[in-house]
Amino acid sequence: SMAASVVYAGVFSAVLASLPAVSTKMVVFDTAVVDLSEKLADPVEVLFGTQLGGGTDINLALSYCQTLIRQPQETILVLISDLFEGGNAEEMLKRMARIASAGVQVITLLALSDDGAPGFDHHHAAAFAALDISSFACTPDLFPDLMAAAIQRQNISQWASTQGLTSERARKA
């Protein structure tokens, strides 16, 4: 279940949205996409306004996120997903490749919780790794440091490794 990840993502998104130096968007998805960006000033609204059902269409969510990207070189996209794609997996991988090649810094969190890495789609994580996109589980206490590293354009795979977070990319390297 992604429930803990949704809660932490809502809290961290609200905190990031309160920082004047960054522009924060929050998009949640199952088989539909909901943009909660306008609600980020009220974390309670975000948390209780998030009703996700079953199913996952990552490709649809990425398609929507592409419409939000104005400055790819200054964009960090954090995808929180187990990478099990219920939509068009081939198109999802192509879309992610286009997003990354445009200069967007993409980070895939398999979970944002204290529970460690859940079951996840290893094939998609490996495909992301081939695009230099790390996939790993991150604990809430390390998330602020992760975002600091991303903002500073540090190598996220190396950062994850130094934190003891095993990334799919680190395993392949």
Regions found by a protein language model. Name each.
Residues 1-9, 13:
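MIDAS-like acidic motif and immediate structural context at the N-terminus
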Residues 17-21, 70-71, 98-104:
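Arginine/glycine-rich "motif VI" loop of SF2 helicases in the C-terminal RecA-like domain
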Residues 29-34, 113-115:
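Short glycine-enriched loops at secondary-structure junctions
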Residues 34, 42-78, 85-90, 117-120:
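Von Willebrand factor
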Residues 90-173:
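Von Willebrand factor type A / integrin I
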Residues 19-25, 31:
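Amphipathic alpha-helical interface segments within eukaryotic helical scaffold
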Residues 26-28, 77-79, 108-110:
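Structural beta-sheet core signal
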